[in-house]
Curated annotation (Swiss-Prot):
InterPro entries the record matches: Ribosomal_uS4, Ribosomal_uS4_arc, Ribosomal_uS4_CS, Ribosomal_uS4_euk/arc, Ribosomal_uS4_N, S4_RNA-bd, S4_RNA-bd_sf
Gene that encodes the chain: rps4
Basic and acidic residues compositional bias, start-end: 152-171
Cell wall biogenesis/degradation is among the record's keywords: no
Residues in S4 RNA-binding domain copies: 101-165
One Pfam family linked to the record: S4
Gene Ontology MF terms: rRNA binding; structural constituent of ribosome
Lineage of the species this protein comes from: Archaea, Methanobacteriati, Methanobacteriota, Stenosarchaea group, Halobacteria
Family label: Belongs to the universal ribosomal protein uS4 family.
Cellular component annotations (GO), alphabetically ordered: small ribosomal subunit
Function of the molecule: One of the primary rRNA binding proteins, it binds directly to 16S rRNA where it nucleates assembly of the body of the 30S subunit. With S5 and S12 plays an important role in translational accuracy.
The organism's place on the tree of life at top rank: Archaea
One BP term from GO: ribosomal small subunit biogenesis
Stated name of the protein: Small ribosomal subunit protein uS4
Organism in which the protein naturally occurs: Haloarcula marismortui (strain ATCC 43049 / DSM 3752 / JCM 8966 / VKM B-1809) (Halobacterium marismortui)
Length: 171
């Protein structure tokens, strides 16, 4: 018997066709190199969960002080919030804040790839390591503490500075 969850990790939009929403989604997919809209909807659902949790904690005022601190610490650890941000700042987050913390985006922003799509390819093909461990999930959320350890695998052909794909970026 197969094990696993039959629930989706995202929620689809309520209305199937809204031109403005579709244009916004296409823009985000292109900017962050996402494979399909499901990845975008998953990030939106993750953000929706953060905001729901923040509203719950704000509504209960001082009752759940430790939960509030743990929640804020988690978001700060992932780099979604800055160190000085408070609980009500979670409500003003945007989906781009979540998408910026994906491994694919971090690899692209650090200059290891020329495009977000190329960053995705490098990750999926096993050329990228995180804390000396090969990671093949482009949608993985990168913590700020390990962000500096992102790099090419030493056994990868891309670790050579003169590799054609890396030489393109230097020109």
């Amino acid at each position: 018997m197969a094990l696993g969850s039959n629930t989706k990790f995202y929620e689809t939009p309520n209305h199937p066709f809204q031109g403005e929403r579709i244009a916004d989604e296409a823009n985000l997919i292109g900017r962050y190199g996402l494979k399909n809209k499901e990845e975008l909807w998953r990030a939106q659902s993750e953000l929706r969960g953060y905001r729901r949790e923040a509203r719950k904690l704000l509504g209960s005022a001082g009752e759940h002080e430790t939960e509030s601190e743990e929640f804020l610490a988690r978001l700060k650890r992932y780099g979604i919030l800055n160190e000085q941000d408070q609980l009500d700042d979670v409500l003003s987050l945007d989906v781009t804040d979540v998408l910026e913390r994906r491994l694919q985006t971090v690899v692209y922003r650090k200059g290891y790839a020329n495009t977000p799509e190329q960053a995705r390819q490098f990750i999926v093909h096993g050329h990228i390591v995180l804390d000396d461990a090969r990671v093949t999930r482009p949608g993985m959320t990168v913590e700020t503490a390990v962000e500096s350890s992102v790099g090419f695998d030493e056994h990868s052909s891309l670790s050579d500075e003169l590799h054609p794909e890396r030489a393109e970026a230097q020109e």
